[in-house]
């Protein structure tokens, strides 16, 4: 089987209600202020800024900030390596080769108590990549360090890693 064969692909976006609210609440507030000041000509706030400042705020917080928040995603693929990329914070994916894996297993974890929340979390010895949820695959390396890859389909990810390393030396932990 070619290393280019894709055993697994998952793209997870941050789409929880509180996250969408975080993206849209400042945008809505800026839209309201921009309409008041730029369209109706009524200065917005107790100490209003110039129209140029209002245009700047509209572009940055009304358009760019929500677009940025809504494009954050985590892509996980399994080909000849396990690849995890948390866009836009990682320019290149983290690649885990089949020979780097000592053990791996499907786990249920607490993102907040185990890793301090969602995103790229943990320490250099125990890293987690997760978007939401509380399930994933934990991979252990020879030096004892671990990486947890959060997934909405952890059993499929586990099966894909198994298929990837069929000819390798990793040990499966059920």
Where do the protein language model's features map onto the residues?
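Membrane-helix interface/capping segments
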Residues: 72-87
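N-terminal membrane-targeting/pre-transmembrane regions
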Residues: 1-49, 156
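Hydrophobic alpha-helical transmembrane segments
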Residues: 45-59
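Transmembrane alpha-helices and immediately adjacent membrane-cytoplasm interface residues
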Residues: 56-75
